[in-house]
Regions:
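Short, conserved loop/helix-junction motifs that constitute active-site signature segments
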Residues: 5-7, 31-32, 82-88, 107-108
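Rossmann-fold dehydrogenase core element
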Residues: 90-94, 104-120
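Internal alpha-helical scaffold of NAD(P)-dependent oxidoreductase catalytic cores
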Residues: 85, 103-112, 128-152
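NAD(P)+-binding Rossmann beta1-loop-alpha1 motif at the extreme N-terminus of oxidoreductases
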Residues: 1-57, 61
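Residue-level detector of alpha-helix initiation sites
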Residues: 18, 74-75, 99
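Active-site capping/gating segments
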Residues: 40, 115-130
């Protein structure tokens, strides 16, 4: 799946710090429409509004992807708050270190889940990432996760 194909269902990004921001900039540069993105971050950077990325308002009903890009110590609260967004056909993609697939599966019991571990240069678009999926993450979900992580 190409990033432009996500424009119909949307992408929700929870956390837009260094890594989340680097990912989003890469996705936008590769064809993801700003209006297809909804960022959830209490300290959303100003450049989001400048590029037309929403930080307020309702979430898409059935986003194609829910990306979790918060620090591991914040993940417990995020999983509780965002469990409804990771249902149906939504791919849950996490770039947080130290949180197991089992923890994500408790929050999103029916979801395809992929954990990605980008290295530090990914924050400036020069990195590589390792990815691993749960049993529900088939070839299509893994390919989508790989496409998303290739942006950095």
């Amino acid at each position: 799946m190409e990033l432009a194909e996500l424009n119909d269902r949307g992408l929700v990004l929870v956390g837009c710090g260094r890594m989340g921001g680097a990912l989003l900039k890469g996705w936008l540069a590769r064809g993801l429409a700003p209006e297809a993105v909804r960022v959830i971050d209490p300290n959303a950077p100003a450049w989001l509004a400048e590029r037309g990325v929403a930080t307020e308002g309702p979430l898409p009903d059935d986003p194609a992807v829910l990306v979790l890009a918060v620090k591991p110590q914040m993940m417990g609260g995020v999983l509780t708050e965002r469990a409804a967004a990771g249902q149906g056909d939504t791919l849950v993609l996490s770039v947080a270190a130290g949180v197991t697939l089992a923890a994500y599966e408790r929050a999103f019991p029916d979801a395809a889940i992929v954990r990605a571990m980008p290295n530090t240069p990914a924050a400036i678009g020069q990195g590589i990432s390792a990815i691993v999926g749960n049993a529900r993450a088939g070839a299509a979900e893994m390919a989508l996760a790989e496409t998303l992580m290739a942006a950095v």
